[in-house]
Amino acid sequence: MAEKRNIFLVGPMGAGKSTIGRHLADELHLDFFDSDQEIERRTGADIAWIFDLEGEDGFRAREENVINDLTDKQGIVLATGGGSIVTKAVRNRLSARGIVVYLQTTIDKQVARTQRDKRRPLLQNEDPEQVLRDLAEMRNPLYEEVADYIVDTDDQSARAVANQIISKIGL
């Protein structure tokens, strides 16, 4: 690979962005970053606590700053937070600074993959499946808008999805 290019993974929670991103980075010998983990590292607090203290708007402002910093690097794979694309500036940066891959998954798979995860503040309520449906209705068009490639993650291993991405991108 002559030129180091960035690959940015977008998609809903439970799509496998972090797991697939690590495999992708390993295969391509790129650095891997997860925007949520980077926010936690910089603040010393977990995402749920930031949501509780600052609300979603405060969290999104932090997320935008972190994504701006990370997308300025070269030769990385970045797993973004599921809601990062709601911010127009984030969508613009992702599009301008790398290849954007939308990892698509069904609501059923999201429920199965996230049901025991207490670190997802938006799902800590009576009906997480309905929350996921509502989020999908709002966010899926934004994922599609920003995506250079769309890859379904439902019935494949993370490594198989990573290899499919490499093949689609032509790396």
Curated annotation (Swiss-Prot):
InterPro entries: P-loop_NTPase, Shikimate/glucono_kinase, Shikimate_kinase/TSH1, Shikimate_kinase_CS. Catalyzes the specific phosphorylation of the 3-hydroxyl group of shikimic acid using ATP as a cosubstrate. The keyword Zinc-finger does not apply. Keywords: Amino-acid biosynthesis, Aromatic amino acid biosynthesis, ATP-binding, Cytoplasm, Kinase, Magnesium, Metal-binding, Nucleotide-binding, Transferase. PANTHER family: SHIKIMATE KINASE, SHIKIMATE KINASE 1, CHLOROPLASTIC. NCBIfam families: PRK05057.1. It holds the Pfam family SKI. This is Shikimate kinase. It is found in: Cytoplasm. GO terms for biological process: amino acid biosynthetic process; aromatic amino acid family biosynthetic process; chorismate biosynthetic process. Pathway: Metabolic intermediate biosynthesis; chorismate biosynthesis; chorismate from D-erythrose 4-phosphate and phosphoenolpyruvate: step 5/7. ATP binds at residues 14-19, 120, 156. HAMAP family: Shikimate_kinase. Belongs to the shikimate kinase family. Signal peptide: none annotated. It catalyses: shikimate + ATP = 3-phosphoshikimate + ADP + H(+). Gene3D superfamilies: P-loop containing nucleotide triphosphate hydrolases (3.40.50.300). GO terms for molecular function: ATP binding; magnesium ion binding; shikimate kinase activity. Monomer.
